[in-house]
Amino acid sequence: MWALRSLLRPLGLRTMSQGSARRPRPSKDPLRHLRTREKRGPGPGGPNTVYLQVVAAGGRDAGAALYVFSEYNRYLFNCGEGVQRLMQEHKLKVARLDNIFLTRMHWSNVGGLCGMILTLKETGLPKCVLSGPPQLEKYLEAIKIFSGPLKGIELAVRPHSAPEYKDETMTVYQVPIHSERRCGKQQPSQSPRTSPNRLSPKQSSDSGSAENGQCPPEDSSAGANRKAWGRDPSLVVAFVCKLHLRKGNFLVLKAKELGLPVGTAAIAPIIAAVKDGKSITYEGREIAAEELCTPPDPGLVFIVVECPDEGFILPICENDTFKRYQAEADAPVALVVHIAPESVLIDSRYQQWMERFGPDTQHLILNENCPSVHNLRSHKIQTQLSLIHPDIFPQLTSFYSKEEGSTLSVPTVRGECLLKYQLRPKREWQRDTTLDCNTDEFIAEALELPSFQESVEEYRKNVQENPAPAEKRSQYPEIVFLGTGSAIPMKIRNVSSTLVNLSPDKSVLLDCGEGTFGQLCRHYGQQIDRVLCSLTAVFVSHLHADHHTGLLNILLQREHALASLGKPFQPLLVVAPTQLRAWLQQYHNHCQEILHHVSMIPAKCLQKGAEVSNTTLERLISLLLETCDLEEFQTCLVRHCKHAFGCALVHSSGWKVVYSGDTMPCEALVQMGKDATLLIHEATLEDGLEEEAVEKTHSTTSQAINVGMRMNAEFIMLNHFSQRYAKIPLFSPDFNEKVGIAFDHMKVCFGDFPTVPKLIPPLKALFAGDIEEMVERREKRELRLVRAALLTQQADSPEDREPQQKRAHTDEPHSPQSKKESVANTLGARV
């Protein structure tokens, strides 16, 4: 492996898939399902198979999301944080999603939309249509603040006032619903606050009725008359989805019995007629359609409705569209999906409204009272890691609402991840794909791995013989790695986030990628509110989506936690590039009031030598240091995108933690982090991919380790691994007793420094199969490059061609075996 790499260096060639040596990607063709759709043409008839599947069951850590499948189309209803990760883990194809329906402009509904759109763009999907509140268009514009131009995918918004949508599977009608509380008292998370310490919302012409205190008109056209772009928390959009009628099947055997010309061209118009329900006349006989065709499958209806609070109950109950379907016998409602808290479900008005759909309608409930494991692979790997060290790798838990579930008189099912309701071919609930988090099976699987138990026993013996020094055994600071993967959330590793617990009641969050709150829920379970209340500051290193799109949910959930525990609200200190302000402002203007949650400190103001003339900023910086008990909170620009920062936290007790963010090896980071107690450095790529690392402005494992050595860091934790290393990265020869690798939900303190490097042998045993596959892939890539290098060298040496041609005439032909030996000898000589 290393010999192959050394062969390439004197030839001046790149190893593996580096830089310009990589084959350029071919231009993306239309996706296969789009080509199939074009061939099929219009009017294929209703689909044979249609089902709804729960992606997220409405829990606090996952939100509520539904996936709808037919052989023609795929749909997604709501896209909160973590939905993309769940779809990837459970093999629900993202590439087929050309329609996303959103019930309201709330972070629990749209928090994962940015990442989802970027992924759809990468798959080559040419167009995606989003239906829901009109503010969607402004939300998409806001996303471009940090995503850049979304070239390659057309994003269209279908506001609730648009006509019905129709495709090969169904017709979808949008039903706008306005809360009766829209002029009254707002919910806590929507109530404006003012403070000189906080970002002040700008009054703009597009700020909607909530900004100027004007109440919208009370007539039925209120939604259409209010300003299209302003924040409107009183609006939700329900969706009534009617499947196309599926024609009956032609009975071939019956047709033969009746003497019809089966197998000839003459049968085609007969089939078309009877499938349309028309009788035919053949050789003087009239034959009814029912004799030759099974009954058609009616166009069933399903409804998705969100009722966030009691203020929406009366508008829902009095809505004329729902009344029509409650009385419609020709279009039976098979299923109603209720995204509603228990406070709504126990209301007698809402229960009576549910009952009016009749006894044949099923009801699916999605809310916080739906206990369901979603991230099964994360639970599995954490259970197996805990066999090695249960303190460093604690078992995951879950947050469940303590509120009792309502007793309802209608046929009701509580949501759980991957639960299906099939509409065609047969109406039924299907639980064969739901998740079973069986920890005993996970443990048994690990214990059966070759040498795993032996390596764990050897590791424990080694740790007992070499305990941590007494001065390092303090519990704090405690580092909890919440997301250790790069780019996009995946089933094993979530995107960037690290919690630094400074003390039992103070903590700092270093980056906050999508799904950070969900990771906190799974790590702390019922203690999540306490943890959120202890959060004193967040550092955002740069504005790539995998580093900051979890921030809004942290802010909203933190306010909920403070209220739940009866603690006074204070804005959260956020150290970030100033460009984050524009994103927060846009979201505040068009979705939810958020600015009162934040006291922002520009990261550039914490650079060494930076002058801060603003007295408000001076006070915020002093508050940051005082609240976190820090002597210094310093930042520096790093080598990644524009406005990317690393940071160093120096505690009053003397320890120093340095966080690189995303960067190539950076001298400014080395200088800022001199003599760090702990360096947390990104190691996105394996050794040998140095030029790819330059292209993507990241570091390899050895580069990250070298930064720590030059910094004289006491210990180095590597994280932010490419998702190609799903479970474990490839190890570098530079790994030593001062280096550890991070996993999601890994928890370390300074006293664990001697222990963490000793984890590597049992980790290698646990992931031996994965490591072997990665090594094989690397060696194959390198061997291909070696062969290409030899061919290139021969082609570039014209003076050698004539002797080679002469030898070709005199040498005896080589057997296949001798050719292999010749190549091997050549490689050996080069090495």
From Swiss-Prot:
EC number: 3.1.26.11
Modified residues (Phosphothreonine): 792
Comp. bias (Basic and acidic residues): 798-822
Keyword annotations of the record: Endonuclease, Hydrolase, Metal-binding, Mitochondrion, Mitochondrion nucleoid, Nuclease, Nucleus, Phosphoprotein, Transit peptide, tRNA processing, Zinc
GO cellular component: mitochondrial nucleoid; mitochondrion; nucleoplasm; nucleus
Chain spans, region Disordered: 15-47, 179-227, 791-831
Subcellular location: Mitochondrion; Mitochondrion matrix, Mitochondrion nucleoid; Nucleus
Catalytic activity: Endonucleolytic cleavage of RNA, removing extra 3' nucleotides from tRNA precursor, generating 3' termini of tRNAs. A 3'-hydroxy group is left at the tRNA terminus and a 5'-phosphoryl group is left at the trailer molecule
Compositionally biased tracts (Polar residues): 186-212
Function: Zinc phosphodiesterase, which displays mitochondrial tRNA 3'-processing endonuclease activity. Involved in tRNA maturation, by removing a 3'-trailer from precursor tRNA. Associates with mitochondrial DNA complexes at the nucleoids to initiate RNA processing and ribosome assembly.
Subunit structure: Homodimer. Interacts with PTCD1.
UniProt-recorded name of the protein: Zinc phosphodiesterase ELAC protein 2
Gene transcribed to yield this protein: Elac2
